[in-house]
Amino acid sequence: MKRRRFIQDFGWLGAGLGLIPACTMTPADTKPSKISKAENYFGEWKTQAGLPVFDYLIDQDADLNALWDPIDRPENRRHFHVIGNRALQVVASNRGDIGIFEEREGHRWLFYQDDLYGCGHSLILESGGVRWGSLYSDRPRDTIPLRQFGPTHFSVHSEYEGLKLERTILCPEGDRSWVLVKVQLTLSLDAEPRQLTHIESWPLRPRFLNTFQSDELRDKAALQVSYDINRSVQKIVAQEIFNEPAETIGAPATLLLEDLSPENSGQMSALEDDQWPTLQIETGLDLKPGDTQTLWFRVGRSTDEEISSPESFYEQQLNKVRSRVPKATSLNAPHVTREIPWHVAMLSGGANKDAILGGHTLNQSSVYGFGLGGNAAARDSLQHAIPLVYSEPHLALSVLRNTCTWGSPDGDLPYALTGNKKPLTQLLRPSDQNLWALWLASEYAAVTGDLAAFELPQQYHPDYSAASTTLKDNLKKQAYFFIDYVGRGQNGHVRILNSDWNDMVLQDSMIDKNSMIERGSSVLNSAMGSWVLNRFAPLMENLGERNTADLCRSTAHQLRELVAASWNGRWFDRGYGPPTESQPEGTVIGRDRCWLEVQPWAILCGAASSEQSRSLVEIFKTGHCMHSPLGARVIWPPDLSNSRVGEGTLGGIWYSINMTLIWATAKIDPEFALAQWEAMSLQRHGEAYPSVWEGTLSGPDAWNAPESPRAGRTWSTPAFSMQSFPVSNMHSHSQPVLAWLRLLGIEPTTEGTLAVRSSYEKALGSYVSSTFSASF
């Protein structure tokens, strides 16, 4: 797009602030863009057996809008979504196939799915050479099968001449490393009797995701895997053999395909292919009109767990999901009723039992986990666990302990873990990691009152060969590491090192990186640090660490005063750099443009006055949020000269930052805060960008703003592309839940207690889980 045309189209940018020239506008131009109220393009939401489910209804092969561009590989029509339990993730697609992924010993696929192929399907063979099944490519002619995505299940519903096939993949609750398959075949009353063979088919496709490894090297590593196949009456066991263990991850897995059907026992087989076998169970069936036959299978890691009644087990698992996920209500935002339980199911379904470090990891996922093969960053795992404190506190604690295990005995947390769970310390050296651990610990204690958890044994990463300590001492060391080692930089603010929350904050060509790393500072870290340390202090005090508590409080007070002094007359500065030859008075980041991430924290930590807070809200309304249906941009005004304007940190719309925006403004302008929560919702994305699949069930960490040529999608860089895996980023699930809790006025206090006090004048809504409830 030419610059002149761009300014004509987006001349409203910054006009309200006088920061960039306003173009001539008609009255219609000044109104917010109208959002379509059409039904979801791809299908419809409904409640089924007390749980939210989404019915995918379109014919993706014929629909022009189904084609999407992942940027780093060819365009395709595969729309996928991720569900899981606490041991694995299932990637299910509109093609009717799935993949099974886990992080037990590292990033690997037990059954790989990509844009071309997946695993796990039903094939039905009938007389006369009739062949059809659950794959979209095997659907009966002139039909569009229903594909249903549920909180922990995926199903395909197809029909041919009166014979209905309903195939469901269910992730059982807990740490089970396998899935349950239910195949139900029903013959209508007006059909002729049928003889058929059902084939349960699972091609073996291994895949290992060593960090930053090319597809070619990953292909090579997968080819180092062969299988030793053993068949018995009820199951096929496939034992992996690693012919070149250095190129794989973890120990060889023992996989199984097991027939759990109590009456219809099938015939086991393993079809040899050029690369790996396909595990199959063939079952012959005779159906009379009105008959229903149900077949049951188990697929995944081998297990000795007995399932005497798969039907009862299946119902028990659904009942557990219903009792586990929270319920929410709101007259103002009725879709909260489905979105809160949905988000929590997706969030807890992203957890993985960790066989190396213990506890559970909660990867940010999306392209970071499924593409790059990393668990990044430590802050993200900790951040995503915070809302789980209110529904699954034991899982939140498990994630806290697991993430603290990443670190070293001096209190340092690495930026990330590699695909084989090694600390990644060379890429980025962020300065905020410890704050997220202290925050999660403080919120956990305030909500549960469980102080005994902090006396539990706590390990360090095995690479450090260090003696274990307690969780309390680990967190205490992290606090001192943040205060003493990260320390202070320019103008007394917390040092920025080479990044803070914003990994790209030092990428501006006008910034001297070396001097910033040495002495540069982050007002964002100071503001967040002030809030966090003030909540961590009472936890330390309650654990008998008075000196640490006093240090945290005094540091929090100092930082709050420094943040207050960084007000530049319009907003709070973003950061400071030391004097250089080219900039003898020092560098100021965020004086010419309003960086959103620091502003809410300045309000939350108490640095912003009432007048400043109200002034900031007006800037948010007339700037960051203007004409943006999905919420506030991270920077305002955007740099129109940049080809990636409106993407990522160049003005994209970030879940993590907009959660703090909602939280902070809920105390000042509750109506605005609620509107921003709605902008964050799946409902809103479906209304604003109805033909974009991402945003229907899940999303990335950030959306592209309206000024981006790819508005409503997500960012891409020359290094890697979030657009290549634009769903299952845990920010898209954790932040709406935490923002809803904050709208209800639920947050930890400086006394170590929990506040429950909504600023909303009307009846806002409720949040009820098995462990916590609040309503207004």
Located regions from the model:
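N-terminal export signals
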Residues: R5-M25
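C-terminal capping/lid segments that line or modulate ligand- or cofactor-binding pockets
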Residues: P32-D61, P74-G99, H343, G373-A376, ...
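An extended acidic
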Residues: A38-G43, T47, G84, Q89-E159, ...
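Extended, loop-rich substrate-binding clefts of extracytoplasmic carbohydrate-active enzymes
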Residues: V130-W178, E263-I281, G765
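Polysaccharide-binding surfaces and accessory modules of carbohydrate-active proteins
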Residues: L170-E272, I281, F313-K320
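Beta-strand-rich recognition/accessory modules
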Residues: W178, T254-Q317, M516-R519, V532
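Extended glycan-interaction surfaces of carbohydrate-active proteins
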Residues: T329-G373, L400-T418, A479-R519, E561-Y655, ...
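Aromatic-rich carbohydrate-recognition surfaces in CAZymes
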Residues: G374-V494, V523-S526, S530, G651-T665, ...
